[in-house]
Amino acid sequence: MAASHTLWMGLVLLGVLGVLQTRAQAQPSLQPNFQQDKFLGRWFTSGLASNSSWFREKKKVLSMCTSVVAPTADGGFNLTSTFLRKDQCETRTLLLQPAGPPGCYSYTSPHWGMVHEVSVVETDYEEYALLYTHAESTKGLGGQDFRMATLYSRVQSPRPEVKEKFSTFAKAQGFTEDAIVFLPQTDKCMEEHN
């Protein structure tokens, strides 16, 4: 009896360690030698993947938006996004503050009050950037952590290879094919805002 109990406890501990190890591996690494000055400027939000219920409900009506990244005095960013909402252009600005090594930032969600960590996982600065956003769960979200992968591109029509790179990245973060969306282009709200 003691031997089977010990074996059972050993399997449980291995399972727990396996889960912890899997969660740790799920956090993507940062862009090596991230160069903030090259990341500045205009980007198009071309692809998204998320586990949030809001995203699942709205993903069919989302369209591409523009985001302008500008530096702040503390080494962070002002991220100003302009998007189409209910047939009107809406602009929102988030203050991304440094939150660790270069390429890691955080902001507080104006809607939920949660702190989100944003990581620039990969970028070539001239064509695309892959970002990963994570926020610890709160009771208001049903106990589920918020996760999102984002594809930024410098042009409205990213190359198929860039889209494939984003799909592979999103799947590596645990998103399923149906959670990955490439946002359709629109001619509305695409003018440059600073």
UniProtKB/Swiss-Prot annotation:
Active site, UniProt feature: 65
Gene3D superfamilies registered for this protein in UniProt: 2.40.128.20
EC main group: isomerase
One Gene Ontology term, aspect cellular component: Golgi apparatus
Glycosites: 51, 78
Source species, domain of life: Eukaryota
Subcellular location: Rough endoplasmic reticulum; Nucleus membrane; Golgi apparatus; Cytoplasm, Perinuclear region
Entry-annotated residues carrying Pyrrolidone carboxylic acid: 25
E.C. code: 5.3.99.2
A GO molecular function held by the record: prostaglandin-D synthase activity
Stored InterPro entries: Calycin, Lipocalin, Lipocln_cytosolic_FA-bd_dom
Keywords: Cytoplasm, Disulfide bond, Endoplasmic reticulum, Fatty acid biosynthesis, Fatty acid metabolism, Glycoprotein, Golgi apparatus, Isomerase, Lipid biosynthesis, Lipid metabolism, Mast cell degranulation, Membrane, Nucleus, Prostaglandin biosynthesis, Prostaglandin metabolism, Pyrrolidone carboxylic acid, Secreted, Signal, Transport
Broad class of where this protein is predominantly found: endoplasmic reticulum
Family the entry assigns: Belongs to the calycin superfamily. Lipocalin family.
Reactions catalysed: prostaglandin H2 = prostaglandin D2
Biological role: Catalyzes the conversion of PGH2 to PGD2, a prostaglandin involved in smooth muscle contraction/relaxation and a potent inhibitor of platelet aggregation. Involved in a variety of CNS functions, such as sedation, NREM sleep and PGE2-induced allodynia, and may have an anti-apoptotic role in oligodendrocytes. Binds small non-substrate lipophilic molecules, including biliverdin, bilirubin, retinal, retinoic acid and thyroid hormone, and may act as a scavenger for harmful hydrophobic molecules and as a secretory retinoid and thyroid hormone transporter.
Domain characteristics, as noted in the entry: Forms a beta-barrel structure that accommodates hydrophobic ligands in its interior.
Subunit structure comment from the entry: Monomer.
Keyword check for Oxidoreductase: no
Disulphide-bonded residues: 89-189
SUPFAM superfamilies the record matches: Lipocalins
GO biological process, one term: prostaglandin biosynthetic process
Protein name per its UniProtKB record: Prostaglandin-H2 D-isomerase
The keyword Transmembrane helix belongs to this UniProt entry's keyword annotation: no
Signal sequence, start to end: 1-24
